[in-house]
């Protein structure tokens, strides 16, 4: 009798135990990491979020805490998600939400229960520091609300986030970041430029966003070196990476993502300025897949038969950029080099007028390594680029760069 009651009691305890207590088991859910500036008509991304949350009528908890105006941002996101078939609702938890105590809200059991009963969670854009401020206790432990979010993820739900909501996906995130050039020229510090994220993707992958549009691929490099990351994923605007429980990355939406591999990279500590040798950088286009565990790449259907033949280059012109940190400059350079008779391409980064370190610049040298591979789409001019080498070296910049022609 005693044994029977003990087993029954154990089963009852297990049934009533929050999923947070089962933290040792890997999450069974998915991540949708969006690079910001997600358009309302980007059906591929919105529909995938709803699908992964459970399909038509799925409950999705919207956390607008990063936004400058949480009420307006939350209402907008709920409207978009519901247009694509969800049953979304705003979670009233935000540092800037007027008339509320975010510390109390983060520990409210009814609020946590509403999150836990959802099939998905969506973090809006804005300031990622406000997300962690609201969800993480001062001692670094998880609030009840954050545990509920993890419960959704563990049991198979989706965690989605755009811009700031993407930044919190890794265990380290940019916080009070300088410009991209300022980050290269002045470095990064723990607790100032870099702070802990929420870590949904795991401790081994660094995530950044607005990547190609704002030249942020370059700021991934010092952050990854500082924190010891070997793998980084950067997602561009109006585009998303979907990462399932098998850790396979699928790119959907408007453009693509960059995969940064520092496995064989090195930096010369004798040079006080930022420098990096033998990094590998890949561009994953929409429809492409990459498995973070097996490191296997699967091209989209329109590129499966389009492997670039380096013996038959399409272009022969030199490739150069005087502003490698500019809008889409890195992607343009990589695309123009992968199917080119030229072996390397050079991009220059320098301080903007009024920015510190006017005498300093950086050369970004992209080159094709023996194992660099490209795939061309049969439907568009898009390419996928795998394993292009990147070396970054400091330069001395002479001012002014130019004068009137006489």
Model-derived regions: residue spans:
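Glycine-rich, highly charged phosphate/nucleotide-binding loops
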Residues: 101-111
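C-terminal and late-domain segments of enzyme folds
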Residues: 24-57, 62, 67, 71-75, ...
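Catalytic-core regions built around general acid/base machinery
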Residues: 110-114, 141-156
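Bacterial N-terminal signal peptides
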Residues: 8-19
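N-terminal secretory signal peptides that target proteins for export/translocation
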Residues: 1-6
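Glycine/threonine-rich flexible loop motifs
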Residues: 128-142
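Catalytic nucleophile loop
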Residues: 122-125, 148-149, 153-174
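An anion/phosphate-binding loop that grips the pyrophosphate of nucleotide cofactors and donors
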Residues: 118
């Amino acid at each position: 009798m005693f044994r029977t009651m003990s087993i029954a009691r154990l089963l009852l305890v297990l049934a009533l135990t929050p999923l947070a207590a089962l933290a040792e088991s890997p999450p069974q859910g998915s991540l949708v990491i969006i690079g910001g500036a997600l358009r309302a008509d980007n059906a591929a991304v919105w529909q995938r979020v709803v699908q992964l949350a459970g399909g038509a009528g799925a409950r999705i908890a919207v956390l607008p805490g990063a936004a400058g105006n949480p009420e307006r941002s939350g209402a907008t996101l709920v409207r978009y998600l519901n247009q694509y078939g969800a049953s979304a609702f705003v979670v009233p938890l935000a540092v800037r939400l007027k008339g509320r105590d975010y510390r109390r809200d983060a520990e409210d059991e009814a609020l946590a229960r509403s999150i836990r009963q959802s099939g998905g969670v969506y973090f809006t854009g804005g300031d990622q520091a406000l997300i962690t401020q609201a969800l993480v206790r001062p001692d670094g432990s998880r609030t009840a609300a954050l545990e509920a979010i993890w419960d959704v993820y563990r049991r198979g739900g989706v965690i989605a986030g755009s811009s700031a909501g993407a930044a919190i996906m890794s265990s380290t995130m940019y916080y009070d970041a300088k410009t991209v050039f300022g980050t290269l020229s002045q470095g990064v510090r723990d607790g100032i430029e870099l702070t802990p994220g929420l870590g949904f993707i795991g401790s081994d992958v660094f995530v950044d966003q607005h990547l190609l549009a704002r030249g942020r691929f370059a700021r991934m490099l010092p952050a990854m070196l500082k924190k010891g990351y070997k793998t980084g994923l950067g997602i561009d605007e109006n585009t998303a990476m979907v990462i399932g429980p098998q850790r396979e990355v699928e790119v959907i939406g408007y453009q693509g993502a960059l995969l940064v591999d520092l496995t064989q990279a090195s930096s010369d500590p004798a040079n006080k300025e930022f420098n990096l040798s033998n990094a590998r950088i890949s561009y994953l286009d929409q429809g492409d897949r990459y498995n973070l565990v097996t490191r296997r790449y699967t091209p989209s259907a329109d590129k499966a038969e389009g492997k670039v033949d380096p013996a038959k280059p399409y272009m022969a012109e030199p490739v150069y950029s005087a502003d490698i940190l500019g809008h889409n400059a890195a992607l343009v350079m990589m695309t123009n080099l992968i199917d080119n008779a030229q072996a390397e391409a050079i991009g220059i980064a320098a301080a903007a007028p009024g920015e510190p370190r006017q005498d300093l610049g950086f050369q970004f040298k992209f080159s094709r390594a023996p194992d660099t591979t490209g795939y061309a789409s049969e439907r568009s001019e898009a390419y996928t680029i795998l394993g292009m080498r990147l070396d970054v070296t400091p330069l001395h910049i002479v001012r002014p760069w130019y004068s009137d022609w006489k």
